[in-house]
């Protein structure tokens, strides 16, 4: 509830140095005169006449006051009554401009107080009594004072639970220091006073609230064109109670710096509305396009954008932060079907409230009109992502849903990657989830972990990837048979019933009956004989029984099925117990087999099916005996055996290091090699001649 941006205190340096000019001169033209020829030139402070106009320059104090008041205006516009900002002016003493009371948290009170303070006088002699430290001490004392919200929380909790009330804050000090040493001294004094204040707030004194944490931002401002010896520094943790960051900025750019800081302090975002059609002030018959920058919560963009959208950003001239550019959308008539649902609304305030484009946009919205804003898609098209409208004298930005919303129908599960799939076993998956459901018990059930590991091991996602589960739609007794197989408490009667069903399959295979399924993935099953179909069915059935062989009745069923397979001419090879289990939940019986190369003499259909079954059996019997590391290691060894090993490894004794290029640099060896390379060339020349 009480965040760090709940309390913000501005400490303004009111010493003599802040009375000097900022050295940014502004041309002021008379109504009936012409603009001065050197309107943008710089000169001495004061009035400089030239042509038909004059120039003036703001003082450092004026720049600091204007930018800090704009900061608090943005805060109070976007968080009315929720965030508090105080001002303290420091010269020979600390002057409190306003308090935490809501009656002083408004623009009129602050501006009237600043007018009474006035610009620092240049006639005052320089003295050590003029210091910003007075204001920093008063700021720490102000942080210890409770706000109205904290007072209400204290009343609810009671005086015994005061330490539970969070109390964090931020102090923004606008001053001017000579060098880094002076800035370091300022940090140390602030940290010392902060610790002393917490000591006073602790029992038994209890003078105010304990400050949990403080964020000190020091803005070192200088006139335009003046180099400062104070270096910028990012956020640094001085102590568990204090974080400090330092920014050196010229006086004309302090407003951009504070706008940049307020984005991070209050989690805001900048949006520039571009291409706003507006009548020109001097020519009412023509119009021009203008841009207006507004500030709002960052969530206005984050909840709108999806993976198909990218925010168009740009950096304003003179600023250091990014702003999102959204285009003004010409109002058009649309029905209810064209309106997007609103994901959220957030208060909006313009950056430059006194400019003519901002004033025109605000009046346009306050008169009951709405503005749609467009953002580009990655595909090149555009989408209406935001809407500006006003209600009750306040302007809001509405984030519109440009992606699939929760009110839209969910995408079909059949339209997945790889094409359209229409035979997902959704009902069976629901039954599996019900069977795998666990409930908390006071005493641990030792049978629960095996159940969780056993049930999901073999579950084909689609009907077309399994013969056994495909046939349960066509064979009446098969669903009940599969249900009995997964029972943990199978009895003798269930075993006899299952054996009868297995014998029925054997009799059907003996008669040569074709299994009652016709299509797999929309095409006919490519098996030449009914015998091959039964072999695949027996194989999958054996895998399923092995997974559920938890009782003696399951093992009897497994032995009965294996004996039938042996009588049928498809006896399983002996392998490790883990081989078939690994095969059961890694591949389905209809997965493509890795066939051996077929010679020209064995290209018949029956030999193809036999090789299919043999390859499948070989893979089932051997895949569980080798791990992935064994497979990769054997592949690397087979590749390394194809080429000779490094001679240094072969010739160097164990424990010694082989020397690369031992003959490199040996002149005798080089001469021998050179002579050996020249001799064949001489022989070739003699042969050619």
UniProtKB/Swiss-Prot annotation:
<comment type="similarity">
    <text>Belongs to the Integrator subunit 13 family.</text>
</comment>
<dbReference type="GO" id="GO:0005737">
    <property type="term" value="C:cytoplasm"/>
</dbReference>
<dbReference type="GO" id="GO:0030317">
    <property type="term" value="P:flagellated sperm motility"/>
</dbReference>
<dbReference type="GO" id="GO:0046843">
    <property type="term" value="P:dorsal appendage formation"/>
</dbReference>
<dbReference type="GO" id="GO:0051663">
    <property type="term" value="P:oocyte nucleus localization involved in oocyte dorsal/ventral axis specification"/>
</dbReference>
<feature type="region of interest" description="Disordered">
    <location>
        <begin position="578"/>
        <end position="619"/>
    </location>
</feature>
<keyword id="KW-0744">Spermatogenesis</keyword>
<dbReference type="GO" id="GO:0005634">
    <property type="term" value="C:nucleus"/>
</dbReference>
<dbReference type="GO" id="GO:0007346">
    <property type="term" value="P:regulation of mitotic cell cycle"/>
</dbReference>
<dbReference type="GO" id="GO:0032039">
    <property type="term" value="C:integrator complex"/>
</dbReference>
<dbReference type="GO" id="GO:0051642">
    <property type="term" value="P:centrosome localization"/>
</dbReference>
<dbReference type="GO" id="GO:0051301">
    <property type="term" value="P:cell division"/>
</dbReference>
<keyword id="KW-0469">Meiosis</keyword>
<feature type="compositionally biased region" description="Low complexity">
    <location>
        <begin position="600"/>
        <end position="614"/>
    </location>
</feature>
<comment type="function">
    <text>Component of the integrator complex, a multiprotein complex that terminates RNA polymerase II (Pol II) transcription in the promoter-proximal region of genes. The integrator complex provides a quality checkpoint during transcription elongation by driving premature transcription termination of transcripts that are unfavorably configured for transcriptional elongation: the complex terminates transcription by (1) catalyzing dephosphorylation of the C-terminal domain (CTD) of Pol II subunit Polr2A/Rbp1 and Spt5, and (2) degrading the exiting nascent RNA transcript via endonuclease activity.</text>
</comment>
<dbReference type="GO" id="GO:0048471">
    <property type="term" value="C:perinuclear region of cytoplasm"/>
</dbReference>
<comment type="subunit">
    <text>Belongs to the multiprotein complex Integrator, at least composed of IntS1, IntS2, IntS3, IntS4, omd/IntS5, IntS6, defl/IntS7, IntS8, IntS9, IntS10, IntS11, IntS12, asun/IntS13, IntS14 and IntS15. The core complex associates with protein phosphatase 2A subunits mts/PP2A and Pp2A-29B, to form the Integrator-PP2A (INTAC) complex.</text>
</comment>
<keyword id="KW-0498">Mitosis</keyword>
<keyword id="KW-0963">Cytoplasm</keyword>
<keyword id="KW-0217">Developmental protein</keyword>
<keyword id="KW-0597">Phosphoprotein</keyword>
<keyword id="KW-0539">Nucleus</keyword>
<keyword id="KW-0131">Cell cycle</keyword>
<keyword id="KW-0132">Cell division</keyword>
<dbReference type="InterPro" id="IPR019355">
    <property type="entry name" value="Cell_cycle_regulator_Mat89Bb"/>
</dbReference>
<dbReference type="GO" id="GO:0051321">
    <property type="term" value="P:meiotic cell cycle"/>
</dbReference>
<dbReference type="Pfam" id="PF10221">
    <property type="entry name" value="Mat89Bb"/>
</dbReference>
<protein>
    <recommendedName>
        <fullName>Protein asunder</fullName>
    </recommendedName>
</protein>
<keyword id="KW-0221">Differentiation</keyword>
<dbReference type="GO" id="GO:0060814">
    <property type="term" value="P:posterior mRNA localization involved in anterior/posterior axis specification"/>
</dbReference>
<keyword id="KW-0175">Coiled coil</keyword>
<dbReference type="GO" id="GO:0080154">
    <property type="term" value="P:regulation of fertilization"/>
</dbReference>
<dbReference type="GO" id="GO:0160232">
    <property type="term" value="C:INTAC complex"/>
</dbReference>
<dbReference type="GO" id="GO:0160240">
    <property type="term" value="P:RNA polymerase II transcription initiation surveillance"/>
</dbReference>
<feature type="coiled-coil region">
    <location>
        <begin position="521"/>
        <end position="550"/>
    </location>
</feature>
<dbReference type="GO" id="GO:0007283">
    <property type="term" value="P:spermatogenesis"/>
</dbReference>
<feature type="short sequence motif" description="Nuclear localization signal (NLS)">
    <location>
        <begin position="613"/>
        <end position="619"/>
    </location>
</feature>
<dbReference type="GO" id="GO:0034472">
    <property type="term" value="P:snRNA 3'-end processing"/>
</dbReference>
């Amino acid at each position: 509830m009480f965040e760090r941006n709940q309390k913000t205190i501005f400490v303004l340096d009111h010493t003599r140095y802040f009375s000097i000019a900022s050295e940014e001169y502004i041309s002021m033209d008379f109504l009936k005169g012409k603009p001065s020829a050197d309107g943008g030139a710089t000169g001495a402070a004061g009035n400089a006449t030239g042509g038909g106009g004059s120039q003036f320059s703001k003082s450092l104090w004026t720049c600091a006051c204007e930018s800090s008041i704009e900061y608090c205006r943005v805060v109070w516009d976007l968080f009315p009554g929720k965030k508090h900002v105080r001002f303290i002016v420091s010269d020979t003493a600390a002057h409190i401009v306003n308090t935490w009371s809501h009656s002083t948290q408004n623009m009129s009170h602050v501006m009237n107080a600043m007018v009474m303070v006035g610009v620092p006088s240049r006639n005052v002699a320089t003295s050590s009594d003029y210091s910003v430290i007075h204001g920093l001490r008063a700021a720490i004392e102000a942080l210890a004072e409770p706000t109205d919200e904290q007072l209400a929380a204290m009343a609810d909790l009671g005086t015994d639970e005061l330490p539970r009330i969070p109390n964090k804050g931020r102090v923004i000090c606008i001053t001017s220091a000579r060098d880094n040493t002076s800035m370091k001294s300022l940090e140390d004094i602030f940290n010392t006073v902060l610790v002393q204040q917490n000591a006073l707030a602790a029992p038994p004194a209890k003078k105010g609230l304990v400050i949990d944490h403080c964020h000190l931002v020091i803005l070192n401002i200088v006139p335009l064109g003046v180099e400062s010896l104070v270096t910028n520094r990012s956020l640094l943790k001085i102590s568990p109670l204090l974080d400090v960051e330092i920014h050196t900025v010229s006086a004309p750019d302090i407003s951009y710096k504070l706008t940049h800081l307020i984005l991070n302090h209050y989690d805001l975002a900048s949006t520039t509305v571009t291409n706003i059609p507006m009548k020109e002030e001097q020519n009412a018959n023509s119009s021009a396009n203008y841009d207006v920058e507004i500030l709002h919560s960052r969530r206005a963009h984050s909840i709108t954008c999806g993976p198909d959208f990218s925010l168009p950003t740009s950096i304003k001239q003179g600023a250091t932060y990014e702003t999102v550019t959204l285009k003004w959308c010409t109002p058009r008539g649309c029905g209810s079907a064209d309106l997007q649902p609103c994901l959220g609304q957030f208060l909006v305030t313009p950056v430059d409230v006194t400019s003519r484009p901002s004033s025109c946009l605000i009046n346009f919205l306050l008169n009951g009109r709405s503005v749609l804003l467009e953002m580009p898609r990655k595909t090149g098209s555009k989408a209406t992502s935001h809407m500006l409208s006003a209600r009750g004298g306040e302007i809001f930005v509405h984030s519109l849903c440009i992606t699939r919303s929760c009110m839209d129908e969910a995408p079909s599960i059949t339209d997945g990657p790889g094409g359209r799939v229409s035979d997902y076993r959704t009902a069976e998956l629901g039954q599996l989830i019900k069977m795998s459901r666990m409930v908390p018990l006071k005493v641990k059930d030792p049978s629960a972990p095996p159940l969780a590991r056993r049930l999901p091991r073999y579950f084909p996602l689609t009907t077309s990837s399994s013969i056994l589960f495909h046939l349960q739609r066509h064979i009446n007794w098969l669903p009940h048979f599969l249900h009995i197989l997964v029972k943990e408490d199978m009895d003798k009667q269930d075993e006899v019933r299952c054996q009868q069903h297995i014998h029925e399959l054997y009799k059907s295979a003996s008669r040569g009956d074709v299994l009652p399924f016709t299509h797999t993935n929309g095409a006919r099953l490519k098996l030449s004989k009914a015998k091959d179909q039964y072999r695949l069915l027996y194989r999958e059935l054996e895998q399923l029984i092995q997974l559920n062989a938890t009782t003696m009745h399951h093992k009897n069923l497994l032995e009965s099925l294996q004996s039938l397979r042996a009588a049928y001419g498809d006896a399983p090879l002996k392998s490790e117990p883990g081989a078939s289990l690994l095969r059961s939940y890694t591949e389905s019986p209809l997965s493509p087999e890795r066939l051996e190369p077929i010679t020209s003499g064995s290209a018949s259909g029956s030999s193809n099916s036999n090789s299919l079954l043999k390859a499948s059996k070989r893979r089932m019997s051997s895949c569980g005996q080798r791990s992935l590391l064994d497979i990769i290691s054997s592949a690397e060894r087979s590749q390394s055996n194809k080429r000779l090993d490094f001679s240094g490894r072969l010739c160097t004794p164990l424990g010694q290091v082989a020397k690369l290029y031992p003959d490199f640099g040996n002149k005798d060896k080089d001469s021998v090699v050179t002579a050996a390379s020249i001799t064949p060339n001489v022989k070739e020349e003699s042969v050619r001649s």
